[in-house]
Amino acid sequence: MEPLLWHVDATTPSHIQALQSGSLPPASPAAALTRVQRALSFFRTAARKYCKQADAPDLFALAMTRVAEHNDIAVDARNVEQLFHFVGQHVANTAERKALRAALREQRALFKASLPGACFPAPAPPGWGIPKPPPLPPPFVWKGCRYNVVAPPPRIPQPPPLPKFAPFVRNNFRVVAPPPLGEVYQPVGAPFPQTRASAALSFFRTASTCRQVLVESCIQQPAFMTCCASTGEVQEMTSMLTEARQTGKILTPKEVSQALAQKRKEIKGAEENRISFDEGVHLTEADVFHRLSLAKRFMAHKRDRTLVDVLMPTEHEVVRYPGTRPDGTLQMCVSALPRMSEEAARKLLEKGWKNSKNVSLDIGVTSYMPYGAPIVAFMTIMDGRTDDPQEAALCANYMDLGREKSKVLSLPLVTIPLSEIEHDQGILDCLYIVTYFHGVQSYQPGTLMMSYGTLEFQEYSNNSFTTATRVRESWDQILKRNENLGKRVHAGIGVLGTIEKEMDQQLEDFPAINLETRPRPVVRTFQNAHQPLHKTRSMRIGTTSFTGNTGRTVLPPVVKTYEEGNANFDSLQSKPRHSSASTAHLMCAVTVVPDPTCCGTLSFKVPKDAKKGKHLGTFDIRQAIMEYGGLHSQEWCAKGIVNPTFTVRMHAPRNAFAGLSIACTFDDYKRIDLPALGNECPPSEMFELPTKVFMLKDADVHEWQFNYGELTGHGLCNWANVVTQPTLYFFVASTNQVTMAADWQCIVTMHVDMGPVIDRFELVPTMTWPIQLGDTFAIDRYYEAKEIKLDGSTSMLSISYNFGGPVKHSKKHAISYSRAVMSRNLGWSGTISGSVKSVSSLFCTASFVIFPWEHEAPPTLRQVLWGPHQIMHGDGQFEIAIKTRLHSAATTEEGFGRLGILPLSGPIAPDAHVGSYEFIVHIDTWRPDSQVHPPMFSSAELYNWFTLTNLKPDANTGVVNFDIPGYIHDFASKDATVTLASNPLSWLVAATGWHYGEVDLCISWPRSKQAQAQEGSVSITTNYRDWGAYWQGQARIYDLRRTEAEIPIFLGSYAGATPSGALGKQNYVRISIVNAKDIVALRVCLRPKSIKFWGRSATLF
């Protein structure tokens, strides 16, 4: 503020009386002092029109200087008032004031909360500033036991009288020392410490006077400028001369400079990193700093006093795996490295400490990777005040995450000025950590890799001149390394031997990376900000090989320098230029990296007003791989059958306002018939099959990774067949709440990992009969989007607990794999877990509570909060235990329990928003408890397949024949009326793709005549191929009077397992009935012995 005042005063014409006195000559020092007083009074009075702060002149000077520099103008007396009022209008705005100085918020709050009686300036002109304060209250009287104290009334501070200078004459120059400041009384109810305001104003007055006198002296005596020294140098030289006089030797100025240079202390090994492999090595304050006795502390000169402290600014900061970029390069992860809190820095500043030096930084890392895993982390400490990586990178190190603990220590990193925290808010958090991971094979992005904590040793000084320090001189005194590497098992009781996983796996070379700085935030200015360039500078770090002392076994490299040459390189064979593949690819750009995992693409248009159930696109996996070609199709053709892992990546632009979600359904057995569904994809029907729902608000690239064998139970053949056709269906899962500007394009890429070679078609069965569940069962079921209206209604939403048996949807009945499995028992109990994803627009938000409920009537909030519940705020996970009157819910019936959803608060949306708050519930896992539930049928496990009535025998022979093949399907015949039965066995066959095993075919029939009058027989034979070929096995003939028969049959085909349909020539059972007109009905039942099922699917009927 003071230089700006003098610049304005120097440009003020002599005839202007607003800033100078007319009674004194303009050239006299008294007149200069009067001008300074008037200038300060003008700025104080004008500044308080906009801001009630003690340091308002400094605030306005900073703002005016920045505005003048931005507009390329000079501040003088002609434009100072206009510029001041322009800046004041911006400072009056809370946002602009916050951008200038965040520290003023605390003072502003104190001012508003201050008591009446604070000193106020002269009345402001009409229309400026805040309302005038209320009149002063009567004096406050506090009565004690024996005395009365009356607080004096507040008084407005008056400018001090003109200082009287005591001249001190020297040979070549003159120094004027101002008188000491007087005591300033702080009135009751002052909004801020009066000592700070008085000290600031006194400093400006004194500094302005001294500056004026100094300028006049420099003009009169030019030699004075060559003799001016800083205050610290004068004091240091004075003390050295005094010490020399006492010892009897007078030093020359050159000898004094040499003596001062010898007093500097430098730490050996600064800017180095030291890695300690011992978990027991911990630095203490005594290891880093010299201890001083109390006598030395108090006898030391004030300028040489230091304060040391040990802080732990970071206790537990986690670092997750960021994944790799689409081109395969490593991606960085930025994490915080704070120094101290702003409150702690202000307390140190109030005590007089100006600078904070980072003496030593101890970073401890805890790895969450398996022991011995060859994963390396590259950690770099960066300076956030620069965008140049070469300047920002302070120190870096490679960490072996195969060891649980790692530690890194480094000597001085940076010194920060505590006195500038108000002007530069980025000082306290100027350091951050950039981490790269290498060696990760299959961990998903977001996996927790490690965590770190920091221990910081700081030294504070009260000035910038002193060279005193308490830091020890070398690394050897700070750190004593103690390596403790060895076996996993060191000792034990009764241990004869140990088997341990290899810990010394060779570390792979860390690839080259582009070290970048963190993005810069947007800084608000007084003028319109220009659009920044979307470019960042980077620093290339080459490939690093770990062949030194890493604690792991190092494999000797095999280098072949010349082909077919001896030690003398006699037979050196040259190759033509650009003849090798490695040099041929160098002609391409280094940033263009082909993706070796991509095996197919799909593009489709999304309507701007996409409606729920809209079919967007179909992706045939087998056809896409063959058409895409490349290494994957060649490898697939060579292996014939593989068990791949697919990754579906949908590239859709992130948009949190559309309120749109797109789903992807996997169908391997041609169960989805789009024409039968009206060329639409109803979400309730599609969700019965394996599905993944993508919300456009979550990311720009949405991924779904699944293993083909886990979903289908078998390998993927490269030849097309009539049974399997792996297909992905993309459709709109929820209607977008905000209509887009136009139809937009979406790209889907399919990526594959072929996996190891397999030698069989069937893999691990998905389910075996009899059904046996483990500790958990994967339901994996999405439910159609629920919505909470904006009309303020609090009606309860629910999801029924009938998780078994067929269910009726909007267009079709459906039976899924999870419904078929859970329908074997009459009831179920336990805990269900899942997630909730909001598919609503960002304009609409709400919170709700999830709870178990049984009744139709909605509960009260007290009933909900008394029981198990979970409050959801947007997206989140939940786990709810079932709660019914009998602790269980019926598997195939409604009304015995439901998952209740009750709006809690909201929804909140703008006035123009017309949609509701929508969310999708996904039930992932069921965890049964110890409750026992009986099966649906008796322990005999006999299930009816079909019943034949109205038999139509041949008119001539009176015989009727029925062929029952070796696979379970919907039996049909033209010679009788067929009634198909429905039971858990038939549901499981319909919900899977393949089955195989042995069953007993149980046949029974009622007759219409009495036993003694009954004539006829039933012939049952096992056959293969056509009947005329007579490939027959067992053949039995039963009298019609017996009414029942049993015969075993194998379910399968030439491929092993069989689908629910004909697959080549299969074995079958022929039933021939003589005199069939006397049979009322023929029932065919199945008694399973051992059946295996493959594939998670569903059937729509």
UniProtKB/Swiss-Prot annotation:
GO terms for molecular function: structural molecule activity. InterPro entries: Nepo_coat (IPR005054), Nepo_coat_C (IPR005305), Nepo_coat_N (IPR005306), Viral_coat (IPR029053). Gene3D superfamilies: 2.60.120.20. It comes from the Viruses. GO terms for cellular component: host cell plasmodesma; viral capsid. SUPFAM superfamilies: Positive stranded ssRNA viruses (SSF88633). GO terms for biological process: transport of virus in host, cell to cell. Keywords: Capsid protein, Host cell junction, Transport, Viral movement protein, Virion. Specific enzymatic cleavages in vivo by the P1 encoded 3C-like protease yield mature proteins. Belongs to the nepoviruses RNA2 polyprotein family. Virions are comprised of 60 copies of the coat protein. This is RNA2 polyprotein.
